[in-house]
Amino acid sequence: MNSLFASTARGLEELLKTELENLGAVECQVVQGGVHFKGDTRLVYQSLMWSRLASRIMLPLGECKVYSDLDLYLGVQAINWTEMFNPGATFAVHFSGLNDTIRNSQYGAMKVKDAIVDAFTRKNLPRPNVDRDAPDIRVNVWLHKETASIALDLSGDGLHLRGYRDRAGIAPIKETLAAAIVMRSGWQPGTPLLDPMCGSGTLLIEAAMLATDRAPGLHRGRWGFSGWTQHDEAIWQEVKAEAQTRARKGLAEYSSHFYGSDSDARVIQRARTNARLAGIGELITFEVNDVAQLANPLPKGPYGTVLSNPPYGERLDSEPALIALHSLLGRIMKNQFGGWNLSLFSASPDLLSCLQLRADKQYKAKNGPLDCVQKNYHVAESTPDSKPVMAAEDYANRLRKNLKKFEKWARQEGIECYRLYDADLPEYNVAVDRYADWVVVQEYAPPKTIDAHKARQRLFDIIAATISVLGIAPNKLVLKTRERQKGKNQYQKLGEKGEFLEVTEYNAHLWVNLTDYLDTGLFLDHRIARRMLGQMSKGKDFLNLFSYTGSATVHAGLGGARSTTTVDMSRTYLEWAERNLRLNGLTGRAHRLIQADCLAWLREANEQFDLIFIDPPTFSNSKRMEDAFDVQRDHLALMKDLKRLLRAGGTIMFSNNKRGFRMDLDGLAKLGLKAQEITQKTLSQDFARNRQIHNCWLITAA
């Protein structure tokens, strides 16, 4: 009896043990990452030919303690390598693991290689050559703490390489894991199987091979035993012949069918090629199709299983599309696949919850470094009175109502950017802004008392409902999570896409960036204030302080201002302001842009302006500003400097976002100024719910 070890992906060990026992293995013992077992020579070959789950089958040769590199060398050399290699056989060493002595796996592999070569030269035998790419014999050494385990890898290449996939092709899941997913899916061979996001077809091909009794090793050309002296070619040929006979019989007798689709025509072509090379191409129908067009291929029965490994993302900006995809799949399953089973394998359990289905079973597994889950569902048969379920139905109804109200109003106003929803319902605490045919969903960070998983699920429901109600493409929804604005956080950089969208606001054309910053370059709540500035600016010298992207300057320029001066500390935003001005034909000496600390510039400037717009931060302690600034505390000092720059008969429009801001009217009077609050006049319909989003004042000489 041979003592053997079969390695596998984490989480599949028990499944592999059952598979090996069914092949005839005895004394199976599960350990992390594999199964120790025993079997005769025939079982060695059968495990190589028939195991769908094993990554490699190895023949342990011995162990040694490693306290120095000499210990490793002598421990390896103690094995009788000359009796193991056929004459002229090439070899390669795979070394994994480190300890205090062997700190580099390449060094460990070199020591093992030297020991094997020296074992031949000491007996005056020809030394075997190393062939890293296609060796006849693979030696596997695993170092754990002070113990090195040495084994012969009888597989050669990993057993996931079945021989039907082009090695150059990238597979999101290995064939061994795909086989496990099929086995755990609840699918019964003989019933239909459909994968609506099949990629290169791995799940369907593995299922078809299982269903038709086709050995996974049947199409492999190379093995790790070809240079091994104990290889029994006669038994191997018997095992191979039996596998070929069973495959022919299984294919001839199989009557059910497999269906695969994907939106990428190139991967569908690869899937067809892979299925043909695997010998089961005639059983699978592959189509280029998007999930949105998914339809039941057998509406009159029989029932089958939908099995897939849908995409999952690691970046926030990929989530809206994925949420929409999973929500859509859930709806299609309920509407068209009543009575069917569904099994999905994913690294994102939160995305699976977007299906709005209850799982009957779930399994955990590793896909490389990723922790994954497989969930199995049974889709209830639909009845005549079944109503489609909408995620976040209360939110969806409110959004639908708001859309009807604001869409017509915005068209009449001549604006493309407006707020559609502003935390109207407390449990759906988001803002939804439309920018032409794009939508930005801003989630206010939930309090720590709210369960993070529930908050995330609610956000997913919101995104799914938003896409459904507005009828937008998922890739035109941008998701942002933000805390209530706190000073400098307002301008936090999020990304580097550099994608700008041109939008219109009344008669102005403006650039917005929906992805790279917390804000987009256009404060929607200041829209009416900007229009008022345009109406007030004809023939006047206009100053814009804390200008951000200069949208107020654009309105003033289009309103006929004699000159505009735009001041901000950020070079990024000044360059953005320049692009906005250029987009509207506002160029030349009459339109100055100044990069400066606005407070310092204000103290030093001695020019005169007819119209000044200032929208300072509520609080700022930027390193580039000379002093910390608090708008409540410091607004009088600000007005004192502004008065010096204000030409006789001129006007200051002063705005800020501090909730509960109190204008010091007595202090203003002492400066010879008076203030008129115009906040209500500057709040448009889409911000009517949020009366405190900003406050706005007109200040003139008393």
UniProtKB/Swiss-Prot annotation:
PANTHER family: RIBOSOMAL RNA LARGE SUBUNIT METHYLTRANSFERASE K/L (PTHR47313), RIBOSOMAL RNA LARGE SUBUNIT METHYLTRANSFERASE K_L (PTHR47313:SF1). Residues 43-154 form the THUMP domain. This is Ribosomal RNA large subunit methyltransferase K/L. Specifically methylates the guanine in position 2445 (m2G2445) and the guanine in position 2069 (m7G2069) of 23S rRNA. It comes from the Bacteria. It comes from Escherichia coli O6:H1 (strain CFT073 / ATCC 700928 / UPEC). InterPro entries: 23SrRNA_methyltr_KL (IPR017244), DNA_methylase_N6_adenine_CS (IPR002052), RlmKL-like_Mtase (IPR000241), RlmKL-like_Mtase_CS (IPR053943), RlmL_1st (IPR054170), SAM-dep_methyl-trfase (IPR019614), SAM-dependent_MTases_sf (IPR029063), THUMP_dom (IPR004114). GO terms for cellular component: cytoplasm. The keyword S-adenosyl-L-methionine applies. GO terms for molecular function: 23S rRNA (guanine(2445)-N(2))-methyltransferase activity; RNA binding; rRNA (guanine-N7-)-methyltransferase activity. Belongs to the methyltransferase superfamily. RlmKL family.
